[in-house]
Amino acid sequence: MSLLRIIVLSGVVLGGVFLVWRIVPAKSRLQVLQSGPYFPVVSGFNLNRQEFEFPRDFERELNLVIVPFQQYQQNTVNTWLPAVQEIEVAFPGFIYYEMPTIYEMPVLSRTFINEGMRAGIPDQTARERTITLYLNKSEFKSALEIPNEEDIFLFLVNRDGEILWRATGAYSAEKADELVQVIKAVR
């Protein structure tokens, strides 16, 4: 084998390893550090392949976490987006995140799902704020007192991880008004 072939083959292998390392989302971490109304410590990658750990990496003082469990629930998530985008404009200390929550799975499956979502979501803000969690869903649901996966769950969380408000299901004016009242009360 010529030296040139060895160099080219080595470059291809190293390039492939780097590419896989760059796009493969790691398994999420889950730690329940406090009982009561606190968001557990979780890690995941957004659709721009950046790793986050929450609550440490919450960007603002008040963070709305929207948790869907099934792909079809994206339609329910979408009912909230216009309202939470308006709330974000009205209250600079507020931001929202989507955290699709999926069972732990092999690396190729995680890559396939994340890259599929990435391809289907061209909006840069949505990519930045969609952090997929691959973890033990039973422990996650137990920590957040989520009884089932039949609907989406929303949590208003401060930087310390304290849950200030929670709701279930599609947007309604009543739920949004309640959220705004809580935001006003803690500001």
Question: Which ranges hold each PLM region?
Answer:
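Solvent-exposed loop/turn segments at secondary-structure junctions
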Residues: 71-73, 102-106, 137-139, 162-163, ...
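N-terminal "domain-start" segment that seeds a small globular fold
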Residues: 27-54, 79
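N-terminal targeting signals for export/organelle localization
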Residues: 1-38
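Loop/turn elements at helix/coil->beta-strand transitions in domains of secreted/extracellular proteins
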Residues: 60-62, 92-95, 151, 159-160
